[in-house]
UniProtKB/Swiss-Prot annotation:
The lineage of its organism: Archaea, Thermoproteota, Thermoprotei, Thermoproteales, Thermoproteaceae. The keyword Nucleotide-binding applies. InterPro entries: GTP_CycHdrlase_3, Nucleotide_cyclase. GO terms for biological process: biosynthetic process. Keywords: GTP-binding, Hydrolase, Nucleotide-binding. GO terms for molecular function: GTP binding; GTP cyclohydrolase IIa activity. It catalyses: GTP + 3 H2O = 2-amino-5-formylamino-6-(5-phospho-D-ribosylamino)pyrimidin-4(3H)-one + 2 phosphate + 2 H(+). This is GTP cyclohydrolase III. Gene3D superfamilies: Nucleotide cyclase. Belongs to the archaeal-type GTP cyclohydrolase family.
Length: 221
């Protein structure tokens, strides 16, 4: 089974509104601070985090003990202007785990499976068409992947540039996902007991495809 941690910043909207209309520069600085705390605290315990609304944060946490998760969340609390709550979900897929958050399901935790995906030749496309063109292509890829994840049971996030990260239920799930993506892509897929190690392996696979100037998928176990 896969394990997901869902973190919520309680009262975040009310806090932002309390700052008055000249507030966005403050909000952005605080969001950056929380984002940094999220990544440093959760990767330190082997989990793979991301934000998908700045008042909600998520982490793939297969095989990460509960007390380590408590420690990671405590570090986020120290960076947050509001109370921080979290729940843990377990499921046969990462998406199932997210949807069951707080239901106290139990089971043997599987290896984490993570994909690191990018669009081929985006550097040249950016040089010719400009960065907004590449950014919109990346968002199209993410939107397509997110739709496919409803069927596959995965969760996809934008990483920046032309990259996305995907929490996968199993390695072969990447093929069902990429079948729907129109742009030529490379995907490294990492498999490991701990999610951040799986992501590191996925990046190694992606780097190998780039070095060989190949498209497709490379799985690293």
């Amino acid at each position: 089974m896969h394990k997901v941690v869902l973190i919520s910043l309680r009262g975040y909207r009310e806090w932002t509104e309390s700052l008055g209309p000249r507030r966005e520069h403050i909000i952005q600085k605080v969001q950056a601070r929380i984002h940094g705390a999220l990544w440093s605290s959760f990767t330190a315990v082997g989990a793979l985090p991301h934000h998908f609304r700045y008042d909600y944060l998520i982490a793939l946490a297969n095989n990460v003990p509960r007390h380590w998760i408590d420690t990671a969340v405590a570090k986020i609390r120290r960076s947050s202007p509001v109370e921080v709550d979290y729940c843990i979900g377990m499921g046969e897929t990462p998406l199932d785990a997210y949807r069951s958050c707080g239901e106290h399901k139990e089971g043997k935790e599987s290896n984490a499976v993570v994909a690191h995906v990018d669009i081929v030749n985006s550097t040249d496309a950016t040089r010719i068409n400009g960065p907004i063109h590449t950014y919109l292509r990346a968002l199209d890829m993410l939107r397509t992947a997110a739709g496919a994840c409803e069927d596959v049971g995965c969760i996809a996030f934008y990483l920046g540039g032309d990259n996305m990260v995907v929490y996968l239920p199993e390695p072969k799930a990447i093929y069902a996902l990429l079948d729907r993506v129109e742009a030529p892509v490379r995907a490294g897929v990492g498999v490991s007991p701990r999610p951040y190690t799986a992501f590191v392996k996925a990046t190694k696979g992606l780097d190998a495809l780039r070095a060989e100037n190949k498209t497709g998928v490379k799985v690293v176990r």
